[in-house]
Amino acid sequence: MEKFKTLFFVKSSLISLYLALTIPIPFISIDKLKIISMIVFVIGLYLIINITSDYVETCNNKISYKNSFICKTLGRKNLEISWKDIKLIKSLPTSQDSKVYYFITNKGENFLIPQRIENFEKFLSIVSKNTGIDINDTTYISPIWTYQLLTFISLLMIIGELIAFLN
Protein backbone atom coordinates (compact mmCIF):
# COMPACT_ATOMS: atom_id res chain seq x y z
CA MET A 1 0.00 0.00 0.00
CA GLU A 2 1.29 3.43 -0.96
CA LYS A 3 0.21 6.69 0.68
CA PHE A 4 0.44 10.02 -1.15
CA LYS A 5 0.05 13.15 0.97
CA THR A 6 -0.69 16.67 -0.17
CA LEU A 7 2.39 18.23 -1.73
CA PHE A 8 4.51 20.02 0.90
CA PHE A 9 4.69 23.27 -1.06
CA VAL A 10 0.92 23.33 -1.54
CA LYS A 11 0.45 23.04 2.22
CA SER A 12 3.22 25.52 3.01
CA SER A 13 1.91 28.10 0.53
CA LEU A 14 -1.62 27.97 1.95
CA ILE A 15 -0.50 28.02 5.58
CA SER A 16 2.08 30.79 5.09
CA LEU A 17 -0.42 32.91 3.10
CA TYR A 18 -2.99 32.44 5.87
CA LEU A 19 -0.40 33.51 8.44
CA ALA A 20 0.71 36.51 6.38
CA LEU A 21 -2.86 37.74 6.00
CA THR A 22 -4.07 37.09 9.54
CA ILE A 23 -1.13 37.60 11.93
CA PRO A 24 -1.70 41.39 12.09
CA ILE A 25 -5.40 41.11 12.97
CA PRO A 26 -5.06 40.46 16.74
CA PHE A 27 -2.57 43.34 17.00
CA ILE A 28 -4.71 45.90 15.19
CA SER A 29 -8.01 44.83 16.77
CA ILE A 30 -9.69 47.04 19.31
CA ASP A 31 -9.12 45.91 22.89
CA LYS A 32 -12.54 44.24 23.21
CA LEU A 33 -11.82 41.99 20.21
CA LYS A 34 -8.17 41.04 20.81
CA ILE A 35 -8.91 37.77 22.63
CA ILE A 36 -11.67 36.79 20.18
CA SER A 37 -9.45 37.55 17.18
CA MET A 38 -6.66 35.41 18.66
CA ILE A 39 -9.08 32.52 19.20
CA VAL A 40 -10.43 32.86 15.65
CA PHE A 41 -6.84 33.01 14.35
CA VAL A 42 -5.96 29.70 16.07
CA ILE A 43 -9.18 28.04 14.87
CA GLY A 44 -8.50 29.22 11.31
CA LEU A 45 -4.95 27.89 11.44
CA TYR A 46 -6.24 24.53 12.67
CA LEU A 47 -8.78 24.44 9.81
CA ILE A 48 -6.16 25.24 7.14
CA ILE A 49 -3.76 22.59 8.46
CA ASN A 50 -6.55 20.01 8.71
CA ILE A 51 -8.03 20.72 5.27
CA THR A 52 -4.63 20.27 3.65
CA SER A 53 -4.21 16.85 5.27
CA ASP A 54 -6.17 14.87 2.67
CA TYR A 55 -4.27 12.00 1.08
CA VAL A 56 -4.53 9.21 -1.47
CA GLU A 57 -3.81 5.52 -0.91
CA THR A 58 -3.21 2.92 -3.57
CA CYS A 59 -3.07 -0.85 -3.29
CA ASN A 60 -3.31 -3.77 -5.70
CA ASN A 61 -7.10 -3.54 -5.95
CA LYS A 62 -8.05 0.12 -5.73
CA ILE A 63 -7.28 3.76 -5.23
CA SER A 64 -8.71 5.50 -2.14
CA TYR A 65 -9.20 9.20 -1.50
CA LYS A 66 -9.05 9.90 2.24
CA ASN A 67 -10.42 13.22 3.46
CA SER A 68 -9.46 15.12 6.58
CA PHE A 69 -11.76 15.35 9.59
CA ILE A 70 -12.97 18.84 8.64
CA CYS A 71 -13.72 17.85 5.03
CA LYS A 72 -15.72 14.86 6.27
CA THR A 73 -17.57 17.11 8.70
CA LEU A 74 -18.45 19.41 5.80
CA GLY A 75 -19.92 16.46 3.90
CA ARG A 76 -17.09 15.34 1.66
CA LYS A 77 -16.90 11.56 1.54
CA ASN A 78 -13.93 9.25 1.21
CA LEU A 79 -13.87 7.63 -2.22
CA GLU A 80 -12.64 4.28 -3.46
CA ILE A 81 -12.29 3.26 -7.09
CA SER A 82 -11.38 -0.23 -8.16
CA TRP A 83 -8.56 -0.30 -10.72
CA LYS A 84 -10.64 -2.52 -12.99
CA ASP A 85 -13.43 0.11 -13.03
CA ILE A 86 -11.20 2.83 -14.49
CA LYS A 87 -11.73 2.99 -18.25
CA LEU A 88 -9.70 6.04 -19.26
CA ILE A 89 -8.17 9.33 -18.22
CA LYS A 90 -9.73 12.47 -19.66
CA SER A 91 -8.17 15.93 -19.58
CA LEU A 92 -9.99 19.25 -19.51
CA PRO A 93 -8.44 22.71 -19.86
CA THR A 94 -8.55 25.23 -17.03
CA SER A 95 -8.92 28.99 -17.36
CA GLN A 96 -5.22 29.35 -16.39
CA ASP A 97 -4.11 27.39 -19.47
CA SER A 98 -3.43 24.23 -17.50
CA LYS A 99 -5.22 20.88 -17.46
CA VAL A 100 -7.16 18.88 -14.91
CA TYR A 101 -7.48 15.14 -15.33
CA TYR A 102 -10.32 12.78 -14.50
CA PHE A 103 -10.62 9.05 -14.12
CA ILE A 104 -13.60 7.94 -16.20
CA THR A 105 -15.12 4.69 -14.93
CA ASN A 106 -16.97 1.99 -16.82
CA LYS A 107 -20.17 3.37 -15.26
CA GLY A 108 -19.47 6.83 -16.72
CA GLU A 109 -18.52 8.39 -13.38
CA ASN A 110 -15.83 11.10 -13.28
CA PHE A 111 -13.28 11.29 -10.45
CA LEU A 112 -10.79 14.14 -10.30
CA ILE A 113 -7.21 12.88 -10.33
CA PRO A 114 -5.25 14.38 -7.42
CA GLN A 115 -2.58 16.54 -9.04
CA ARG A 116 -1.19 18.17 -5.91
CA ILE A 117 0.30 15.14 -4.17
CA GLU A 118 3.86 14.19 -3.26
CA ASN A 119 5.58 11.64 -5.50
CA PHE A 120 3.11 12.38 -8.29
CA GLU A 121 5.24 10.56 -10.87
CA LYS A 122 5.24 7.42 -8.71
CA PHE A 123 1.48 7.74 -8.28
CA LEU A 124 1.05 7.96 -12.06
CA SER A 125 3.24 4.90 -12.62
CA ILE A 126 1.06 2.95 -10.16
CA VAL A 127 -2.04 4.12 -12.05
CA SER A 128 -0.52 3.04 -15.36
CA LYS A 129 0.61 -0.33 -13.99
CA ASN A 130 -2.80 -1.14 -12.53
CA THR A 131 -5.00 0.20 -15.36
CA GLY A 132 -2.83 -0.12 -18.47
CA ILE A 133 -3.66 3.51 -19.32
CA ASP A 134 -0.97 5.74 -20.84
CA ILE A 135 -0.13 8.51 -18.36
CA ASN A 136 2.70 10.24 -20.26
CA ASP A 137 0.76 13.49 -20.82
CA THR A 138 -0.55 13.74 -17.24
CA THR A 139 1.15 16.48 -15.19
CA TYR A 140 0.80 18.59 -12.06
CA ILE A 141 -2.02 21.11 -12.32
CA SER A 142 0.50 23.94 -11.99
CA PRO A 143 4.29 24.03 -11.78
CA ILE A 144 5.82 23.46 -8.35
CA TRP A 145 7.69 26.77 -8.56
CA THR A 146 4.37 28.65 -8.31
CA TYR A 147 3.75 27.18 -4.85
CA GLN A 148 7.37 27.82 -3.86
CA LEU A 149 7.08 31.44 -5.00
CA LEU A 150 3.83 31.96 -3.09
CA THR A 151 5.42 30.48 0.05
CA PHE A 152 8.47 32.74 -0.34
CA ILE A 153 6.39 35.89 -0.89
CA SER A 154 4.15 35.01 2.07
CA LEU A 155 7.20 34.53 4.29
CA LEU A 156 8.51 37.93 3.16
CA MET A 157 5.15 39.45 4.12
CA ILE A 158 5.37 37.84 7.58
CA ILE A 159 8.92 39.15 8.06
CA GLY A 160 7.79 42.62 6.96
CA GLU A 161 4.89 42.52 9.41
CA LEU A 162 7.22 41.48 12.25
CA ILE A 163 9.67 44.27 11.43
CA ALA A 164 6.83 46.83 11.30
CA PHE A 165 5.41 45.57 14.60
CA LEU A 166 8.77 45.63 16.40
CA ASN A 167 9.56 49.19 15.29
Question: What residue ranges belong to the model's regions?
Answer:
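Non-transmembrane, membrane-adjacent beta-strand/coil modules in membrane-associated proteins
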Residues: 52, 65-123
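Short, charged/polar low-complexity linear motifs in solvent-exposed/disordered segments
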Residues: 33, 83, 90, 129-131
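Short charge-dense sequence patches
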Residues: 31-42, 71-84, 153
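N-terminal membrane-targeting/pre-transmembrane regions
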Residues: 1-29, 108-109, 133-158
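Juxtamembrane amphipathic/hinge helix adjacent to a transmembrane helix
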Residues: 115-142
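N-terminal extramembrane/targeting module of integral membrane proteins
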Residues: 1-64
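Juxtamembrane boundary at the C-terminal end of a transmembrane helix
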Residues: 157-167
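Generic secretory/membrane-interface signal
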Residues: 5, 79, 128-131
